[in-house]
């Protein structure tokens, strides 16, 4: 029996069984384990699933702030079962699986009267069909049912704004596969820099910052709090320019950054690398301008997750950008990584002519604007087309 021949046999479930989670992660490890072993990958997924952002539905703060929706926050797990298959084991009828990481976001739209409203931002990940069940349309059926699952939550929201404003997005590693399922690509190119010494010498200049500080694992909550104002100002500005559009962003949250750090440290420790001394996760200047990064041990690169520079004159902003990039380059080299990487929406290089010109001189065009292996895609909210949606902060920051 195939998925397309009898949909009545297909059962879509949201589950919490830890044994099933482990089973699905052991099965899909081959696709995403990178330099880890299968067991290590499953261990990492268990660790990430128990992180603060993944367990947000258990947060007292969220329960108080969002009493009618907190249960939908955090990481959720789903499977598709085919009951026409032999029932000869606990998971023998499971054919596909996926997960979502649900976070609070903000939005502004024509019906919000110029006010920013909360939104539940649902990000799909881990879409996987088990090897012996491929080619039967199961993944497509699962995503259709996932769409329906979250549509019902939105449609039953009544006056709960964050549920009424629910948005689903994903990061596709299979090109435009999800376009047939209602997801519109919003690709953001990557910038991959390998000529680190040249960039330091010709763009960043001398290290004259003596009052800044490196960021450890959990000592920069106050800095992330600064993103709140910047994010909301950006939404209001985009709304003013595009009053007819639905503009949204994932909200800043310190727990998003620690999620990256858990990944970072786990892979470092399991990959056979020596324990890295003086491992930092970012740098802040004395005025609280700062950069937060992620050591991508799998890809031998340092990825800029977020950069925050208070709005000033362009000249002063670029001066601070140079200082922060210098610190990122130093971190890249210190730990033997080969490239510095960032998304164009994080640092739109064409807005910095000096940086853009230098990168085009130093690097091959395929690195200056590299195709992103994780294509951002969004399912437009009810009543909007893709052209009427703006995804702000569409960067590594909200990747899952």
From Swiss-Prot:
Domain of life: Eukaryota
Pfam assignment, any one: GNAT_LYC1-like
GO cellular component: cytoplasm; nucleus
GO biological process: regulation of cell size
SUPFAM superfamilies tied to this protein: Acyl-CoA N-acyltransferases (Nat)
Gene3D superfamilies in the record: 3.40.630.30
PANTHER family per UniProt: LYSINE ACETYLTRANSFERASE, N-ACETYLTRANSFERASE DOMAIN-CONTAINING PROTEIN
Additional information: Present with 768 molecules/cell in log phase SD medium.
Name of the protein in its database record: Uncharacterized protein YGR111W
């Amino acid at each position: 029996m195939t998925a397309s021949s009898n949909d009545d046999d297909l059962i879509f479930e949201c589950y919490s069984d830890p044994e099933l989670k482990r089973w699905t992660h052991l099965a899909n490890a081959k696709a995403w384990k990178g330099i880890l072993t299968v067991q290590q990958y499953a261990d990492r997924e268990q660790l990430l699933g128990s992180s603060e952002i993944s367990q947000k539905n258990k947060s007292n703060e969220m329960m108080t702030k969002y009493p009618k929706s907190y249960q939908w926050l955090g990481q959720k797990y789903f499977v598709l079962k085919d009951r026409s298959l032999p029932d000869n084991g606990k998971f023998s009828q499971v054919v596909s699986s996926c997960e979502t990481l649900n976070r609070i976001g903000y939005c502004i739209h024509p019906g919000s009267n110029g006010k920013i409203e909360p939104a539940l931002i649902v990000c799909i990940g881990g879409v996987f069909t088990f090897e012996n069940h491929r080619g039967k349309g199961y993944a497509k059926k699962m995503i259709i049912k996932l769409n329906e699952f979250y549509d019902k939550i939105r449609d039953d929201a009544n006056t709960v704004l964050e549920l009424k404003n629910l948005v689903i997005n994903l990061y596709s590693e299979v090109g435009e596969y999800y376009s047939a399922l209602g997801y519109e690509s919003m690709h953001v190119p990557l910038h991959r820099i390998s000529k680190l010494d040249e960039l330091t010498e010709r763009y960043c200049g001398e290290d004259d910052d003596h009052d800044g500080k490196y960021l450890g694992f959990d000592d920069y909550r106050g800095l992330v709090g600064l993103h709140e104002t910047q994010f909301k100002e950006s939404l209001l500005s985009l709304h003013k320019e595009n009053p007819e559009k639905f503009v949204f962003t994932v909200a800043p949250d310190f727990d998003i950054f620690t999620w990256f750090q858990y990944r970072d440290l786990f892979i470092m420790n399991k990959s056979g690398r020596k324990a890295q001394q003086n491992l930092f996760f970012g740098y802040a200047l004395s005025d609280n301008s700062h950069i937060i990064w992620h050591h991508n041990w799998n890809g031998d690169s340092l990825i800029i997750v977020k950069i925050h520079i208070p709005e000033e004159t362009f000249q002063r902003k670029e001066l601070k950008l140079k200082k922060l990039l210098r610190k990122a380059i130093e971190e890249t080299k210190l730990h033997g990584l080969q490239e510095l990487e960032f998304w164009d929406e994080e640092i739109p290089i064409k807005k910095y002519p000096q940086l853009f010109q230098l990168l085009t001189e130093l690097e091959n065009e395929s690195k200056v604007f590299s195709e992103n292996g994780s294509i951002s895609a969004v399912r437009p909210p009810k009543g909007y087309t893709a052209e009427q949606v703006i995804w702000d902060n569409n960067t590594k920051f909200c990747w899952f």
